[in-house]
């Protein structure tokens, strides 16, 4: 095309033409390649620029821009002036409607960047402005397009233009970044940031990020806009998945630029933002930081600890969303295992600290802080918990037992805090850790561990076995707890455990918790003990769960009796047991065993508390003990009980040195001593007796409470309780207090009265404690009981025997009535003996004797004479056959009655003695009725005659030296009872047993009267104690065991009675003196001789060897110091010594023998085989054996034996000829002789006792009288032949 043509065309499109013509012509020229290629751009612009300058709207403007664009495209080598000209005109486009066409033109203009250097900043500025304008338009159009489908083509056009601008900018920066001014670049970037924040279109953001990448790659971003760029990148990182990788790359590139530290600081600032509008950026930043955490940038100094610090700062926003993003991003990052191996310990700890803080957003976590997190939504919480659990599983797999200790500790803390969300595997891991940490109370977080255990225990989702396992952990923790933490830890752990028992139906759980309570008892803080005790008592009284009620009662019992606690705690427990024992709301099978234990409670004379393990009449309540198996017993107590250790002394073991079980028996209060609620106990016992319906239970209570009352140390200081007991007995016997006992075949009112009378009998022991007004009440009750029957009367008699002398004024006042009631009753044999003992005690006491009125004395004498008459008639009525035991018993009562009459006679006033003597002589002679006097009757007759008109007072005379008694004997006969002293020289204790026909009483003395120093030394050696403090404090307590396993054995012949424990003080000495136990029984010496013929006849008669075999059967062999051999046989009441004598006549002259036994063959032991004139013994026993036996081999076979027992005088008790003519075994002879000789010894003791209890007669006179009885003069021994009418024959069958 020619130049003329081009000019013509330019004229046609110039402003000289109308707009329509110009538009039509320009529109045709757009596609005219020749024109576009040859036209001069400056002329073209000059011809049409008025359209843009004048802002002519319409299609012509768009057509003009298109024409320019095509012409520029055809000019491949445009000069910079042409480019500048085009840009200057295009930049004047009036509005955004023409931006798409204009941008296409600008793309062509800037296709060669080096030719736009002069106006590149202008281009950047224009494009930046257009960018914001276009985005505003696009954003509005997008909002409208959501409401309708109109304008979609226009929107696409603008969107394409908008993205082309970004691409154009990207290309311009890539070609010549150095051409641009920093301020313009920053302005443009600010607009890009604004666009990125305002759009959600991923492609738009991708193009912007591409621009940012280009700028970062080819140039430098200003610090002014750096923060905004980092923020928008963080937003994109979180919000758009497609741009996430680009955002990460942008940050990584920024950390490699010159502004890397500013970029890092910008990232930090973003994490510290607190505005809610920044949450998206923060969460994106969390993702970026988490990604950097796995791959630390090397171009900048940035540690993992710093990055974790960024994450830590982000949590200050208190946003649960941020917490979720943090734990999620970290977990995604940690899935790359390779980098985990290179983490340092401090990095691990920082990481775990961060996760621990995130756990505070979980409501079930241990460190949960309500109100800390905002916008809490259930799904967010669940997601956080899920990711935390994933972290735990990951760490559990990564961390090994040999990992860093501090890291493992922090991991365990993280595990512990999230225990509510753990899987079974992690739970097992956690509790394994807690089990190991339970023994480390000083480690950090130890108290938090216990909170976990407690929460786990109360989580019902766990199994029963797991709960039992947790209780085992509680045991370890509580035992390991330091002293200073016990009040807090025990109150926080143990008390809730105990209080939760009422919600548990499992017997295993109840047993485990109660066992834990008992085992921990010795280290209880005060506040915990009282809280636990209150809970147990509440369950005992109010629980509807039978198992829990039983176990609670057993726990209180165990803590009281089988565990060591502070004395003040023990006192409280005793109070609780007393309340349980009388609470009738508690079922009987649970209540009775508690009552039984309390009845077994004792205090020894050193004030130590123990339990008598041998209660009387246990079979009465055995039915209530079937369910009572107490499993809560301390190991030491169990060991003692299993081994059945008697009197085991544990007082020197360390635990008892700290807490001795010593009872406060004084009126002052002391924290170091236990206090027993004696007053409440006595009150409750009487309450139970009056309200209990089962007679067997009441009977058991009365029997054992009587035994307990014998423990004087327990009740001596409780005057109020004793008075209450006395008043209760009075109300019951007088009918003021009714009983609820169900009448049955087993219940008789007499048995109840007897039991109550025994209580009254023991109460008399406390007569010195009670006020004098109670003494009269004693006698009034005794008279009331005596009126109720023979059984109660016997108990009353026994009571008066030991107490009437101590309360003389009241005895004188009330005894006459008691005597009258008793003597008018039909007394049994036991009661008769007992009553005679009482009369003897009264008659032997001067004050009581003188206080009796004449009528009373006469009635007593008549009663005794009636007894004498009855027993003499019984003896005479048997004619030939008389049982030796019956004979001895009758003679005992006769002699005793004479002694009582004698004492009463001697004790009366001298002015009344003549009248009384006349009365007694008359009655005595009427009694004899012409029969001959026995020896003792002659003594009594002479007594009456001698003192009828004399006022000589009775005096004591020394014992005659001719009476030699065995000093090692331990028995005395006193007032009709045998007193036996059993000494335990190893322990320094001894007991005195009073055996009488009506029963047995035992007094136990807890110290020996021998050298204390030697005893203490021996005790110290036995105990091997070296502590000086222990020696000073405890070695003075010389006693049997003071702990709970001490046993007091009841006497075998009186199983219902226990010893009365007495301390050997002044009162003990008075008791011994009042018993008058000073006369020992003589040992019965028996001579044994062999009657043999000539030596040549030794083989045809009984040989010496056979004789010694028979002698050995009499008793055990014993060698004396002088070389003599004797044979000793002992029983409970007698001791016999058999001595071989070669010459009976000579032996009997030098010593006093009770009997002579002659053994020989039947041909040698005959009526004339012995010179009777030389025999000075009361009894001769002849044993003759068959003369045809001569070998030892025949000793144990049956053969013919003749046995003769011959009395040498007129001894009425044995005035008989015993003859045994029978085939028996020779070894049966010994028991036969033992029985017979024991009767002889008992008979002798009666007479010698009768002599002793009358000290007003000269001893020599009684010796003469004794020999007179046996018809043996002291100066000349005369032979006495047995009168035939006084000989009785009978045969004894073995």
UniProtKB/Swiss-Prot annotation:
GO terms for molecular function: GTPase activator activity. It comes from Schizosaccharomyces pombe (strain 972 / ATCC 24843). It comes from the Eukaryota. Transmembrane segments: none annotated. This is Uncharacterized protein C18B11.11. GO terms for biological process: negative regulation of TOR signaling. Signal peptide: none annotated. GO terms for cellular component: cell division site; cytoplasm; cytosol; nucleus; TSC1-TSC2 complex.
């Amino acid at each position: 095309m020619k130049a003329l043509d081009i000019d013509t065309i330019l004229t046609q499109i110039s402003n000289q033409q109308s707009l329509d013509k110009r538009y039509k012509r320009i529109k045709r020229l757009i596609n005219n390649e020749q024109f576009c290629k040859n036209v001069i751009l400056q002329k073209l612009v000059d011809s049409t620029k008025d359209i843009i300058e004048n802002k002519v709207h319409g299609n012509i403007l768009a057509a003009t821009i298109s024409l320019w664009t095509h012409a520029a495209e055809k000019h491949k080598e445009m000069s910079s002036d042409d480019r500048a000209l085009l840009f200057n005109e295009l930049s004047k486009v009036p509005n955004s409607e023409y931006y798409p066409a204009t941008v296409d033109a600008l793309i062509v203009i800037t296709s060669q960047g080096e030719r736009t250097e002069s106006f590149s900043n202008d281009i950047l500025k224009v494009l930046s402005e257009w960018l914001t304008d276009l985005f505003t338009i696009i954003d509005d159009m997008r909002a409208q397009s959501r409401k309708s489908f109109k304008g979609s083509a226009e929107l696409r056009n603008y969107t394409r233009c908008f993205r082309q601008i970004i691409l154009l900018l990207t290309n311009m920066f890539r070609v010549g970044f150095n051409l641009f001014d920093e301020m313009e670049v920053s302005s443009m970037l600010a607009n890009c940031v604004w666009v990125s924040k305002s759009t959600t279109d991923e492609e738009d953001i991708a193009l912007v990020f591409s621009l940012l990448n280009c700028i970062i790659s080819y140039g430098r971003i200003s610090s002014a806009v750096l923060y905004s760029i980092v923020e928008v990148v963080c937003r994109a990182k979180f919000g758009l998945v497609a741009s996430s990788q680009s955002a990460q790359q942008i940050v990584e590139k920024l950390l490699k630029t010159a502004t890397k530290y500013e970029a890092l600081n910008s990232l930090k600032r973003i994490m510290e933002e607190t505005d809610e509008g920044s949450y998206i950026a923060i969460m994106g930043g969390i993702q970026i930081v988490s990604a950097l955490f796995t791959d630390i940038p090397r171009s900048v100094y940035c540690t993992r600890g710093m990055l974790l610090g960024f994450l830590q700062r982000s949590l200050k926003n208190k946003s649960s969303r941020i917490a979720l993003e943090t734990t999620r991003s970290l977990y995604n990052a940690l899935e790359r295992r390779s980098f985990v191996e290179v983490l340092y310990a401090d990095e691990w700890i920082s990481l775990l600290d961060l996760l621990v803080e995130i756990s505070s957003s979980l409501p079930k976590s241990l460190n949960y802080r309500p109100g800390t997190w905002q916008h809490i939504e259930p799904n967010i919480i669940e997601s956080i918990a899920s990711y935390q659990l994933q972290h735990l599983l990951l760490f559990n797999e990564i961390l090994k037992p040999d990992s860093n200790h501090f890291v493992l500790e922090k991991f365990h803390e993280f595990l512990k805090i999230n225990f509510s969300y753990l899987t079974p595997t992690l739970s097992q891991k956690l509790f394994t850790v807690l089990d190991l940490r339970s023994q480390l109370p000083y480690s950090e977080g130890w108290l938090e561990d216990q909170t976990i255990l407690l929460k786990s225990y109360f989580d019902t989702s766990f199994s029963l076995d797991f709960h039992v396992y947790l209780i085992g952990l509680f045991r370890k923790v509580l035992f390991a707890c330091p002293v200073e933490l016990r009040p807090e830890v025990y109150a926080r752990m143990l008390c809730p455990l105990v209080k939760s028992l009422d919600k548990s139906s499992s017997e295993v759980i109840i047993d485990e918790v109660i066992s834990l309570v008992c085992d921990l008892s010795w280290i209880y803080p005060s506040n915990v003990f009282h809280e636990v005790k209150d809970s147990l008592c509440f369950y005992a009284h109010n629980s509807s769960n039978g198992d829990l009620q039983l176990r609670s009662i057993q726990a209180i019992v165990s803590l009281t009796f089988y565990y060591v606690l502070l004395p003040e705690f023990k006192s409280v427990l005793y109070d609780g047991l007393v309340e349980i024992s009388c609470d009738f709301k508690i079922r009987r099978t649970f209540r009775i065993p508690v009552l039984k234990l309390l009845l077994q409670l004792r205090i020894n004379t050193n004030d130590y508390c123990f339990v008598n393990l041998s209660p009387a009449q246990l079979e009465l309540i055995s039915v209530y003990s079937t369910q009572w198996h107490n499993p809560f017993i301390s190991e030491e107590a169990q060991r003692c009980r299993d081994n059945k250790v008697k009197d085991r002394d544990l007082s020197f073991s360390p635990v008892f040195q700290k807490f001795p079980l010593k009872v406060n028996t004084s009126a002052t209060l002391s924290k170091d001593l236990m206090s027993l609620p004696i007053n409440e106990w006595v009150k409750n016992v009487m309450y139970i007796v009056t309200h209990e319906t089962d007679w067997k239970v009441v009977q058991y209570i009365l029997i054992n409470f009587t035994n307990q009352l014998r423990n004087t140390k327990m009740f001596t200081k409780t005057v109020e309780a004793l008075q209450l007991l006395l008043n209760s007995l009075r109300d019951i016997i007088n009918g003021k207090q009714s009983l609820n006992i169900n009448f049955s075949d087993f219940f008789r009112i007499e048995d109840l009265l007897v039991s109550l009378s025994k209580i009254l009998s023991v109460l008399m022991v406390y007569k010195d404690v009670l006020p004098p007004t109670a003494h009269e009440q004693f006698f009034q009750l005794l008279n009331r009981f005596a009126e109720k029957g023979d059984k109660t009367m016997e108990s009353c008699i026994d009571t008066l025997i030991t107490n009437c002398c101590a309360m003389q004024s009241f005895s004188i006042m009330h005894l006459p009535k008691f005597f009258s009631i008793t003597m008018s009753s039909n007394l049994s044999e036991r009661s008769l003996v007992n009553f005679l003992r009482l009369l003897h005690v009264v008659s032997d006491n001067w004050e009581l004797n003188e206080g009796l009125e004449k009528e009373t004395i006469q009635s007593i004498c008549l009663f005794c004479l009636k007894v004498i008459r009855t027993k003499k008639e019984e003896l005479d009525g048997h004619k030939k056959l008389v049982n030796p035991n019956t004979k001895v018993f009758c003679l005992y009562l006769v002699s005793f009655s004479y002694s009582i009459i004698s004492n009463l006679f001697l004790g009366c006033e001298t002015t009344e003695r003549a009248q009384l003597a006349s009365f007694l002589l008359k009655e005595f002679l009427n009694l004899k009725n012409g029969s001959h006097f026995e020896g003792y009757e002659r003594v009594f007759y002479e007594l009456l005659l001698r003192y009828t008109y004399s006022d000589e007072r009775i005096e004591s005379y020394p014992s005659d030296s001719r009476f030699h008694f065995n000093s090692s004997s331990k028995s005395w006969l006193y007032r009709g009872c045998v007193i036996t002293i059993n000494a335990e020289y190893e322990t320094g204790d001894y007991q005195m047993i009073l055996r009488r026909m009506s029963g047995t009483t035992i007094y136990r003395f807890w110290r020996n009267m021998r050298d204390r120093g030697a005893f203490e030394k021996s005790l110290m050696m036995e105990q091997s104690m070296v502590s000086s403090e222990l020696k000073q404090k405890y070695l003075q307590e010389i006693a049997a065991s003071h702990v709970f396993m001490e046993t007091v054995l009841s006497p075998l012949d009186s199983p219902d009675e226990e010893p009365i424990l007495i301390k050997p003080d002044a009162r003990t000495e008075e008791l011994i003196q009042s018993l008058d136990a000073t006369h020992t029984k003589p040992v019965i010496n028996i001579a044994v001789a062999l009657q043999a013929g000539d030596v040549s006849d030794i083989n045809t008669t009984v040989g010496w060897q056979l004789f010694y075999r028979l002698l050995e059967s009499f008793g055990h062999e014993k060698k004396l110091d002088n070389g003599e051999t004797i044979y000793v046989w002992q029983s409970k009441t007698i001791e016999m010594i058999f001595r071989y004598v070669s010459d009976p006549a000579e032996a009997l002259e030098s010593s006093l023998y009770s009997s002579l036994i002659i053994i020989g063959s039947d041909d040698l032991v005959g009526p004339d085989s012995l010179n009777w004139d030389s025999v000075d013994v009361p009894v001769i026993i002849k044993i003759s054996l068959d003369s045809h036996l001569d070998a030892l081999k025949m000793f144990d076979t049956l053969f013919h034996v003749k046995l003769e027992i011959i009395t040498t005088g007129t001894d009425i008790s044995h005035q008989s000829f015993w003859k045994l003519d029978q085939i028996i075994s020779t070894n049966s002879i010994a028991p036969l002789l033992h029985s017979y000789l024991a009767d002889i010894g008992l008979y002798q003791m009666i007479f010698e006792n009768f002599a002793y209890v009358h000290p007003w007669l000269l001893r020599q006179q009684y010796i003469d009288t004794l020999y007179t009885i046996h018809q043996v003069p002291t100066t000349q021994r005369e032979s006495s032949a047995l009168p035939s009418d006084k000989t009785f024959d009978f045969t004894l069958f073995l």
